[in-house]
């Protein structure tokens, strides 16, 4: 005979004994049958099904006007029944009764779904977007996306994803989230470096993979959820026990009890868990941007629809400050908040949610539909306040790396022991220094025959992290494995075209992934990449750097055929059959599978002492070349990675040309060897050599879309950031660091003032030799820092500015320059280490030594920090001796409020055999020149021979593609009286201010110079 449930106990039974009997009866019934009674869920139908989800429509066809479409998304770990737990606690029923049209995304139980435990984070986000498409198609309405906990995070991501993949309306009417954190780092203890958290998460991922290789089972997710709030879990059990005698009370809580007890929990797919922990927790991508969904780089900054976020005052899983991270993450959206006196679960289930949450949501929908007012409980959300004494990772890195660099290259082998004894490191410093030691040690151990190259670095990353993102371009993400395969295919194409080891191959390309791919492919093949400048006449470049083959992009190829005089190889822009025209060979048309590898080919065989690439230097008719050995490239790459403490969680933004040293060696190199992501500037964002500025809207769009936290620069490239108005997304920017070389002191000073929490890492690298200096801390604005451990040994020799030669002792050996005085920077030549020899000076400080002149005049302060005084080529050869131009430029740009940029140079006047100091200025936005203040500042700060006698005020300065000022054209224009487009002033004797210079004043100027 089938068992039947016992009848309800007699209501008249009372007293202590009756309560005890009722408690026993109810307890036995729950134990035997799993619950007090079965209930029917709210009516619904499955209207669509995807690879990773089913779409439920609740209360279908029950009224003519279905109302606003609300699509509810559950979190991982919990089933879709979270939205319909019990008749008295049903979100879908409450929404329907409030006039909405409820739909639910059902991810199912991953442990029972085919491939369910293999799902990734992006699988769920794409599923939400597909469900939104289905709802829009069925209703003809935009969708209100609603999500609980991680389901809300999915909604944020899906909305941003829809903005990225379509130029049309994303179709999201609003976003409503419940306990959905955005700023995951808000939960970290103060002072704990996020790098350590990333490492911990990486290790935990390995542990999870070994214990639960297929993901976290449902019982473990339930236990984990309870452990997040153990007090709440215990309280719920006590409440349940206390109510065992009250059947009516038990029935009201029955659905919730069964849901939380076992039925509501599902497995957490392993890949999705690892994605969430790495992208959302360790790298904080919801706040910073740059999470990758279906190959697209996404940022919440693209969201424009209104957002309503519910927070719980006792929510220990998603505290309000973590939820409020949506304000800086989505600055274009209007964000609102409802704060409840509830915990995490109580936001969506239970009496509190039925009294407040769902009625408020219904009122919100009415307001969004234009049929009501903004709900009274809904308040504008304020951005989370900065935490006091919040020590960022970069603060720790700054301190730690400063100590590491101070200890120097010679101590690398024993650094951990020495550092712990001398400094102590207080724990956190240890963790920021030690990860850099293998990089610095690798440089220190490198010898001439050490295998190292760009291609080898890519191969290492492709093996270590094949699915990791290598570079981001035009909104798409490309993995190391995909890039490595692309390089191999290009190599086969080059071999088919006759390129061999050791040959010099010109690369004539704009800044794009194909330019990087071509350079790495030539490195893999063993050829030398000659990186040509697209805006410099090709014939002039080939005259100083002859090539055996020329490789160009489709835009540059046609114009290169005539000056090159032979067939030009074209790479990039492939996909369709195309006719490029005469003299052009389409490498994209070559089938790599049909190319046989020759016996001599050995991939990634480059050694430290070999030339890996050649850069074009100079401008106009003063072009030169810079031979970069593989060691020199490695020094810049590993030096950047170490000084900036780069890792897989970082995104480096490259807006420098890839044919410039900063682009290919600092940005590409640093990202490549560290595993950081390389974000390449959208073409129109990259600075123009003529305009000298960046498109700020696109720049900030790229920064948010890619989650950029490190921006590479060269020269005055960042001037636009400090000259323009504040951008709407600037204050919530994820940028933590600017890294590059040649930043003018004036721009650096203004940049540090405007971006107070952002550090500047300034590099100096000599054209000859392997001299590398780096200012790790950025505290001394204008300093080039200290020698990079692993680089060449450096020394400063005393220099006679007037004679233009070394100052020697009586023995004939060079005198070492005392600290505080100006000297010539020399780099020691160590052939065994694979350093470029060039034309060294021998017997400099002792018999038999060999040093290279870097051409840089420097001064070393009492702390050991180097300051660039000027380059020998820029010295002004005045009547009283040589005058450095850089200190004059620093006065003009750092001590006058109206000056933007300045270039100081030597100018020759008719009848004079020496030069006079001249300056060209640009003014800050909306600023006016003050000739009186200008003259007074120069008179007070500079001595006679250092005072510019002629000053030109221009709208812009001529610059190279690397944003360095081209002083040659300024010298050629002379006084600028015939050049037009500017004003020329001069230092007239007896005047209090600089006065305009007319053609009739030129003789007066010359006479005043002769008279001193």
What are these regions (language model features)?
Residues 2-16, 141, 154-271:
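Alpha/beta-hydrolase-fold enzymes
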Residues 388-478, 482-497, 602-606, 993-1012:
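N-lobe entry segment of adenylate-forming
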Residues 476, 491-536, 657, 882, ...:
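Conserved AMP-binding/adenylate-forming
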Residues 515, 540, 711, 823-827, ...:
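AMP-binding/adenylate-forming catalytic core of the ANL superfamily
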Residues 575, 582-622, 629, 643-651:
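Conserved pre-ATP/AMP-binding loop-to-beta segment of ANL
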Residues 634-651, 659-709:
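Conserved AMP-binding/adenylation subdomain of ANL enzymes
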Residues 673, 700-701, 708-713, 722-799:
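Gly/Ser/Thr-rich phosphate-binding loop
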Residues 903-908, 918-920, 933-1012:
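Conserved C-terminal "lid"/linker of ANL adenylate-forming enzymes
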């Amino acid at each position: 005979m089938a068992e039947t449930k016992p009848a309800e106990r007699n209501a008249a039974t009372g007293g202590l004994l009756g309560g005890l009997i009722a408690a026993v009866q109810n307890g036995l019934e729950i134990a035997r049958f799993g619950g007090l009674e079965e209930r029917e869920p709210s009516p619904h139908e499955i209207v669509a099904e995807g690879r990773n989800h089913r779409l439920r429509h609740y209360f279908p066809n029950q009224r003519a006007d279905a109302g606003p479409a609300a699509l509810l998304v559950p979190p991982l770990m919990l089933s879709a029944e979270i939205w319909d737990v019990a008749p008295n606690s049903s979100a879908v029923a409450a929404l329907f009764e409030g006039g909405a049209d409820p739909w639910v995304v059902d991810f199912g139980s991953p442990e029972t779904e085919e491939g369910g435990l293999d799902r990734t984070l992006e699988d769920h986000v794409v599923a939400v977007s597909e469900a939104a498409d289905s709802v829009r198609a069925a209703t003809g309405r935009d969708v209100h996306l609603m999500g609980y906990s991680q389901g809300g995070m999915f909604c944020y991501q899906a909305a941003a994803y829809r903005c990225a993949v379509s130029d049309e309306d994303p179709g999201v009417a609003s976003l409503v989230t419940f306990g959905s954190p955005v700023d995951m780092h808000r939960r970290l203890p103060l002072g704990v470096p996020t790098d350590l958290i990333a490492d911990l998460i990486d290790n935990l991922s390995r542990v999870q993979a070994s214990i639960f290789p297929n993901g976290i089972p449902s019982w473990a997710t339930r236990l984990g959820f309870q452990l997040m709030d153990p007090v709440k879990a215990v309280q719920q059990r006590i409440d349940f026990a206390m109510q065992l005698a009250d059947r009516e009370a038990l029935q009201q809580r029955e659905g919730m009890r069964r849901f939380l007890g076992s039925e509501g929990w599902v497995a957490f797919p392993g890949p999705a868990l690892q994605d969430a922990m790495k992208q959302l927790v360790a790298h904080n991508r919801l706040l910073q941007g740059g999470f990758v969904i279906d190959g697209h780089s996404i940022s919440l900054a693209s969201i424009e629809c209104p957002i309503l976020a519910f927070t719980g005052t006792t929510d220990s899983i998603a505290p309000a400050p973590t939820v409020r991270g949506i304000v800086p993450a989505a600055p274009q959206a209007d964000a609102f908040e409802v704060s409840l006196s509830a915990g995490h679960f109580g936001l969506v289930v239970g009496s509190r949610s039925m009294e407040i949450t769902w009625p408020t949501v219904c009122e919100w929908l009415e307001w969004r539909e234009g049929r009501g007012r903004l709900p009274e409980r809904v308040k504008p959300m304020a951005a989370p306040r900065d935490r006091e004494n919040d020590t960022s990772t970069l603060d720790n890195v700054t301190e730690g790396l400063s100590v590491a660099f101070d200890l120097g290259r010679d101590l690398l082998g024993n650094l951990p022991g020495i550092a712990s004894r001398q400094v102590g490191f207080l724990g956190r410093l240890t963790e920021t220094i030690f990860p850099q030691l293998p990089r610095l040690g690798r440089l220190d151990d490198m010898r001439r025959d050490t295998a190292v190259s760009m291609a080898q670095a890519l191969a290492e990353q492709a093996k270590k992290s094949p699915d990791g993102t290598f570079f981001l371009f035009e909104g798409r993400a490309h993995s190391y494995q995909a890039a490595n395969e692309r390089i191999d295919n290009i190599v086969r194409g080059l071999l088919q075209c006759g390129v061999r080891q050791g040959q010099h191959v010109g690369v004539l390309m704009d800044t794009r992934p194909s330019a990087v791919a071509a350079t790495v492919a030539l490195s893999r093949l063993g050829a030398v990449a000659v990186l040509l400048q697209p805006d410099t006449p090709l014939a002039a470049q080939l005259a100083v750097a002859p090539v055996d083959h020329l490789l160009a992009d489709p835009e540059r190829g046609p114009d290169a055929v005539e000056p090159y005089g032979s067939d030009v190889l074209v790479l990039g822009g492939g996909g369709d059959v195309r006719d490029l025209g005469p003299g052009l060979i389409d490498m994209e048309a070559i089938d790599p599978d049909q190319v046989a590898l020759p016996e001599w080919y050995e991939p990634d065989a480059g050694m430290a002492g070999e030339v890996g690439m050649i850069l074009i230097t100079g401008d106009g008719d003063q072009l030169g070349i810079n031979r970069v050995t593989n060691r020199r490239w490695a020094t810049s790459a590993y030096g950047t990675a170490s000084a900036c403490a780069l890792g897989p969680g970082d995104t480096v933004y490259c807006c420098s040309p890839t044919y410039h040293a900063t682009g290919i060696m600092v940005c590409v190199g640093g990202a490549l060897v560290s595993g950081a992501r390389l974000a390449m500037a959208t073409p129109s964002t990259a600075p123009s050599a003529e305009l000298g500025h960046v498109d700020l809207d696109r720049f900030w769009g790229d920064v948010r879309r890619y989650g950029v936290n490190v921006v590479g620069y060269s020269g005055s490239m960042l001037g636009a950031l400090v000259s323009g108005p504040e951008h709407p997304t600037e204050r919530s920017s994820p940028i933590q660091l600017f890294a590059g070389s040649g930043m003018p002191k004036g721009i650096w000073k203004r940049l540090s003032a405007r971006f107070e929490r952002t550090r500047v890492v300034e590099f100096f690298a000599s054209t000859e030799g392997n001299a590398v200096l780096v200012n790790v801390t950025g505290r001394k604005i204008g300093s080039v820092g200290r020698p990079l451990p692993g680089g060449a040994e450096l020394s400063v020799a005393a220099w006679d500015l007037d004679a233009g030669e070394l100052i020697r002792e009586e023995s004939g050996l060079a005198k070492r320059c005392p600290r505080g005085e100006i000297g010539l920077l020399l780099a020691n030549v160590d052939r065994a280490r694979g350093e470029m020899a060039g034309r060294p000076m021998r017997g400099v400080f002792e018999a038999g030594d060999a040093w290279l002149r870097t051409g840089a005049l420097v001064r070393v302060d009492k702390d050991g920090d180097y300051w660039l005084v000027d380059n020998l080529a820029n010295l002004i050869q005045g009547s009283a001796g040589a005058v450095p131009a850089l200190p004059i430029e620093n006065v003009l740009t750092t001590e006058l409020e109206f000056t933007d940029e300045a270039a100081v140079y030597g100018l020759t006047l008719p009848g004079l055999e020496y030069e006079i100091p001249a300056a060209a200025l640009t003014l800050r936005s909306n600023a006016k020149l003050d000739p009186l203040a200008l003259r007074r500042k120069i008179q007070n700060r500079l001595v006679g021979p250092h005072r510019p006698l002629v000053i030109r005020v221009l709208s812009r300065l001529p610059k190279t593609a690397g944003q360095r000022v081209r002083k040659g054209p300024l010298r050629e224009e002379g006084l600028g009286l015939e050049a037009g487009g500017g004003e020329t002033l001069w230092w007239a004797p007896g005047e209090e201010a600089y006065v305009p210079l007319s053609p009739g004043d030129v003789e007066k100027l010359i006479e005043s110079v002769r008279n001193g």
